[in-house]
Amino acid sequence: MSRLHLHLVSDSTGETLEMVVKAVLAQFEDTEVDRHFWPMVRSRQHLDRIVPEISAHPGLVLFTLVNEETRARLEDHCRQLGLPAVPALDAVTEALEAQLGQEAHGRPGRQHLMDEAYFRRVDAIHYTIAHDDGVGHENWEEADIVLAGVSRTSKTPTSIYLANRGYKTANIPIVIESPPPDALYKLRNPLVIGLTTAPDRLVQIRRNRLLSLHEDTGTSYADDERVRDEVKFARRMFADNGWPVIDVTRRSIEETAAAAIRLLGQRALQLGEHLRVVVELLLVEEARRL
């Protein structure tokens, strides 16, 4: 197994670097990576303090630094140490500059400014936490998305991920013996999405859950036939109500959330087209009256 020391140097929170690294490392198997995280590096003095640590654990240095002096100093140190120093976002930034015909603003952490989008995310997170697992159905109309599914279909983590993207998300478990409230069937604003999965996969997940809680795995919660019935019941409910469905069997939380956002966008386009047709019909009718 290969082993790599990876140094992440950022003049902001480092969240961008972490996401880039996570996406890239997913393409490499049998690799052990020791990550060394160096956020908020905004001065020469701070940079000089971390260089000995980089030297003690030589490897790849990945950075996002907008200050030219700090960046040049890091590259110079790495050159002396014989280590590669890679700017994570240069290619994207340069491509955008070329297309937009303007230079990027050299200010660190601009994506974390407390703008309208920031407060929308905060509001979405508060809403989502307060509407987890079927709670607060009287306020579901305020949601952007409502996720429905049987137990252990990643409803809560997907909801939280969507909230961090700025989408108010409620979720509700589908239980055969406990029908959801009527409010679920009367929603007009939120997009209701059904989450489903392969029954055999769900059985394994539930058994692992019971084992982690030191509980009996022989209960109906993880029984093969019972789980198949639950999944079938939920799928029938989704079909009867015309709700779009996402199969989470082989999807990560991020992939499930991306699929949900895509469905929401498609609905917005459809509603926009529907509104355009309605307006045109009204104009035609008005013209006839005249």
Which stretches of residues belong to each language-model region?
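NTP-dependent small-molecule kinase module
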Residues: 237-275
